[in-house]
Amino acid sequence: MRIKSIYTLFVCYLAFFSCAKAPDLSETPALTLNGISKEKMKAGSVNQDSVILDIKLTDGDGDIGYVDNDTRKPDMFIIDKRTQQPYDSYILPSIPQQGINNGIIAQMKVKLYTQCCVVNPCDPDPGQADEALPLELYLVDRAGHRSNSLEINLILECKRQ
């Protein structure tokens, strides 16, 4: 009898302590920039150069990725701070709601392609100076919660031989 009660207590102990406590995550998505593959891109058009951003995403309710009557729409946005115009937007994969009661923590790799410089755009000019390319990246979840903004500062190499 004593061994049976010790065994029962041990099983209860394991059951109680083996359940990991869910992280306390906000329902508003949060982004963290872990790294950038390089700081400079050669200016140009149509995917001549790129950088890769390594981003950590957390979201308490996991409502990432839009599906609106089988129509996908962008949910991650990048703004060119030089012009305050959209630089690019992305459609993230939809996260199924089943099994995300504790939210999600994910790593993303985002590829940003180059574009032309503002001064003498995409025209060969060996005397042209490099340009700063400040970008703002943010995400909006299905509930409309906007994440924090990541400030990304790149350099466009505008000189071309």
Features from the language model and the residues they span:
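Sec-dependent signal peptide recognition
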Residues: R2-L9
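C-terminal motif of bacterial Sec signal peptides marking the signal peptidase cleavage site
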Residues: A15-S18
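Bacterial signal peptide processing site
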Residues: A20-P23
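First exposed extracellular module after export/assembly in secreted or surface-exposed proteins
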Residues: T28-Q161
